[in-house]
A protein has these predicted regions:
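Aromatic sugar-binding surface patches on proteins
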Residues: 167-176
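N-terminal secretory signal peptides that target proteins for export/translocation
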Residues: 1-6
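Flexible, surface-exposed loop/linker segments and immediately adjacent secondary-structure boundaries
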Residues: 27-51, 55, 59-65, 69-159
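Surface-exposed, short loops/turns at beta-strand junctions within beta-sandwich domains
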Residues: 176-187
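Edge beta-strands of extracellular beta-sandwich domains
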Residues: 71-75, 193-213
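Beta-strand-rich extracellular modules
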Residues: 61-63, 189-193
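Short, solvent-exposed mixed-charge patches
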Residues: 215-217
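Bacterial N-terminal signal peptides
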Residues: 10-20
Length: 217
């Protein structure tokens, strides 16, 4: 029979292991999105989320467009070896140009905690503005979510809900020719996750840069 001390040690070790796993998961959070990649070998594809330390080999003529989620820096890189790092990429043997664009970090209205509290009221009625987590400057967002299906329901107008297949955790409304109404409020649902977004009244149509229309549910 196990002694009380042995059980305490086992419990402590289990707690320590869970803590280490949580830290590792946090460290492995995506910090960038690969908007486009051409002429490069490897496993990476368009709209992949990238973590610190990820490497992309572009060879001599391959190219990639990478958007950084926190800094809103968008890079166009030709050739070389790219290593994902906080804020911007490290590029060896290639050419890179950078610009700052509108992105999720500048579009968020509510923090995740505030959005969670807002969701508990089940979005019962207006004003919808108080439930909005993100204002999106594009009519066709790129939604990343867990699950197999995304439901899009307009809150401020009587319209049929739209259901979109999630492929690899992504639903690109631009690729599906789905445009949401500028100024409209929409509830996004995937599995047990929900959030409310507002489409900016001046939102642009079409496939804008991915990081400018990215919504992470």
């Amino acid at each position: 029979m196990r002694s009380k001390l042995s059980l305490q040690i086992a419990g402590f070790c289990a707690t320590l292991l869970l803590g280490c796993l949580s830290v590792a998961e946090a460290d492995a959070a995506a910090i960038a999105i690969l908007e486009d990649i051409q002429g490069a070998a490897g496993k990476h594809g368009a709209f992949d989320e990238l973590k610190a330390g990820d490497r992309i080999e572009l060879g001599t003529s391959g190219s990639a467009v990478i958007g950084y989620l926190d800094s809103c820096v968008r890079e166009t890189i030709t050739g070389g070896i790219v290593t994902i790092a906080p804020g911007q990429s490290q590029v060896e043997g290639g050419a890179v140009t950078r610009e700052t664009v509108a992105c999720e970090a500048t579009q968020l209205v509510l923090s995740e905690e505030e959005a969670g509290k807002s969701a508990t009221v089940s979005f019962r009625g207006p004003p919808w503005e108080k439930h909005v987590r993100q204002i999106v400057p594009a009519q066709s967002p790129l939604v990343m979510a867990a699950g197999k299906q995304l439901e899009i329901k307009r809150l401020d107008s009587e319209e049929p809900a739209q259901k979109v297949k999630l492929t690899g955790g992504k639903a690109d409304l631009a690729a599906g020719n789905i445009a949401l109404t500028p100024g409209g409020f929409y509830q996004l649902t995937a599995g047990d996750r929900q959030m409310v977004i507002k489409i900016d009244p001046a939102a642009q149509p079409g496939a804008l840069p991915a990081m400018s229309r990215l919504v992470r549910l």
